[in-house]
Amino acid sequence: MKKITVLFSVICSFFVVLTFLKDGFAGQKENIKDDKEIKAVYISYIELNSYVSGKDEETSKKNITKMLDDIKEFGFNTVIVHVRAFSDSMYKSDYYPVSNTVLNNKNTYPNYDVLEFFIKEAHEKSLKFEAWINPFRISNQTSLDNVSIDSPYYKFIKNKDAAVIEGKGVYLNPASYEVRELIVKGIEEIVKNYDVDGIHFDDYFYPDKKIDLHSYEKYKKDGGILSLEEYRLENITTLIRNVYEMIKVTKENVKFGIAPEGNIQNDYENSYLDVKKILASKGYVDYIMPQIYFGFENQTRPFKETLDEWNNMIKDESIKIIPALAFYKIGTTDKYALSGKNEWIENSDIIKRQILYSKSVSNYNGFSLFRYDYIFNENKYNENTKKEIKSLKEIINND
């Protein structure tokens, strides 16, 4: 009887240990899920032009590694890298020409896959990597001199689905089904072939109010009933829904998010992004990263009220808000802030306070800073920058 009692105790202990281990490992998995607070930095085509373009292989790799080391050592955990800034590609694509931002000192693509190297280095440093896409922009100049002969511009100009827009550059037509199909295929290529953690759009959607007039005229002739404004909003919503669906079918764990302009009225009236619709239900984005590049004292768009407005538009709890913050404004006059124009000069802890306030909103999941050079390139520092960096490090590393 004593032996049976001992055996029973051993068996019970075994199951207790198993239960503990199971719960323990489940807890570990939970801790590394996607709910982790995002602390992101943008690496734009401007940084790529400075540190990768025109460099030999050794130097470009060294510079990429340094950027990622800087970001990791500061305390960030995510990089948002310009993989397709001008309807081009950081890698060898079947749909887009190679980007000038990654051509080497011989003006050719280097002997390594730049995107693959970027991702591998980021992941080795425990950094998430999001591929940043500008879907419709081909150039920010009106001259075609720097537009590759392999650019989609030359395919779509035949049907007026590409245009040179005075004062803005060269763009594709958001109303074109074929243009949207190209964009989705180009992103699918990235998601299938590279271990990205996310796909990221910013605020470049409709470039002007003329590019799609011929498309709308045909739409009306074919029996379309939407107003011009509704038509444009639906074109962008359709693209976003198609990108989201493709990503979830291809690799469900890859996130999709958008960084629209912080001014919601401009999103509707200029970019034709229906932010209320895409934040109302699942199926469009995993996160929204509004560019709230405003100080607390901004006369027309004060930071707190603007962030609250964005947060309150989210109606599905699976969608998170990750405000993008204007590190580049530190120590400068913000003339558009009107009565609050000197706020960034008179204060040196604005970013810190913005992050702390952001943490209080219900759908908060992190923040991002625009952009790498303003944080790490001392040539861009001013009197306030180092003070802001010091206060920022205090909260990033104490979380």
Predicted regions and their residues:
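Catalytic domains of carbohydrate-active enzymes, especially glycoside hydrolases
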Residues: K62-S89, N193-G198, G283-Y287, S358-G366
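Aromatic-lined carbohydrate-binding/catalytic grooves of carbohydrate-active enzymes
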Residues: F74-P110
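Aromatic- and acidic-residue-enriched segments that line the glycan-binding/catalytic groove
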Residues: S89-L103, R137-E166, D203-G224, S339-E343
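Short, acidic/polar
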Residues: S53-K72, V179-I190, N266-G283, F303, ...
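Active-site-adjacent "subsite" loops/lids of carbohydrate-active enzymes
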Residues: I32-S60, E130-A131, F136-N193, G340-I345
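Polysaccharide-binding and catalytic clefts of secreted carbohydrate-active enzymes
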Residues: F156-S281, Y293-F294
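Substrate-binding cleft of secreted/luminal carbohydrate-active enzymes
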Residues: A280, Y284-P302, E309-D399
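Aromatic- and glycine-enriched glycan-recognition loops and surfaces
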Residues: K55-F74, T101-K125, L182, E234-L239
